[in-house]
Amino acid sequence: MRMFRITACLPSPSKIRTQRELQNTFFTKLVPYDAWFREQQRIQKLGGKIIKVELATGRPNTNTGLL
């Protein structure tokens, strides 16, 4: 199965409401090839930024730090 390994940064939702210090959350995730556009839109709607995209093979919901 073709998958993308994406690394993205999202602002923390709890800090946005109080308008204090913004704290960013970085994460790495495996996304299926067919769902890439939907995931990209979701990250951008939340005000996040996509840092890195790589082609990967593997199973969804696995820790990509160990690959």
Curated annotation (Swiss-Prot):
Q: What's the superkingdom here? A: Bacteria
Alphabetical UniProt keywords? Antenna complex, Membrane, Photosynthesis, Phycobilisome, Thylakoid
Boundaries of every CpcD-like domain copy = 1-56
The membrane topology noted for this protein in its Swiss-Prot or TrEMBL record is: Peripheral membrane protein
User: A Pfam family this protein belongs to?
Assistant: CpcD
Q: Does the keyword Thylakoid apply?
A: yes
Q: Which GO terms describe its cellular component?
A: phycobilisome; plasma membrane-derived thylakoid membrane
Q: Where in the cell is it found?
A: Cellular thylakoid membrane
**Biological process, per Gene Ontology:** photosynthesis
Q: Which InterPro entries match?
A: Allophyco_linker, Allophyco_linker_chain, CpcD-like_dom
Protein role: Rod linker protein, associated with allophycocyanin. Linker polypeptides determine the state of aggregation and the location of the disk-shaped phycobiliprotein units within the phycobilisome and modulate their spectroscopic properties in order to mediate a directed and optimal energy transfer.
Which family does the record assign? Belongs to the phycobilisome linker protein family.
Q: What is this protein called?
A: Phycobilisome 7.8 kDa linker polypeptide, allophycocyanin-associated, core
